[in-house]
Amino acid sequence: AFFYNAIFFTYALILTDFYGVASGHVGWYILPFAIGNFLGPLLLGRLFDTRGRRPMIAFTYIVSGILLALTGWLFLRNLIDETTQTVCWMVIFFFGSAAAGSAYLTVSETFPLEIRALAIAFFYAVGTGVGGIVAPWLFGVLIDTGSRMSVFAGYLTAAILMVLAGCVAWRWGVDAERKPLESIAKPLTFLD
């Protein structure tokens, strides 16, 4: 949530403050961003069941983080414009939205049936609460400095968090693909 909210809720500020895009034209840049968010889960989703959840979650988180760090570096060096920045975000969130969506579902699969919905709600609320409050505020402060270096530091922090999350998923993730959920987490009412 930190990664997504940091970028999405401050994207308009990046476009207007650093690239001089008129505020009335920002929506045209957000549309491709939204397309990447939609296509990622749509096209990668089935691979989480065929290739495996754990490797795919790790892959999508790590790729998102690496691409964010690279895009941040290009932004820092002023090597991209508003169009290439948008293409970069589209590609990053193609992978990132698939990662985030699958992670919530995988977390829920490790809990017994009776509390599965509660687990999803809890992890979503905590992730969105922390990421939805802290990330836009922090990136708003960084953008307000007018310094590309400050914004890059924020991007790099988010990138590191994504790569670390991918490593955690690889190490401790659950291989839940093609298995009945009850074999992963027995129902609380299960009798031996």
What positions do the PLM features span?
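Cytoplasmic membrane-interface "Motif A"-like loop-to-helix N-cap segments
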Residues: T50-I62
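A membrane-interface helix-boundary motif in multi-pass transporters
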Residues: V141-I160
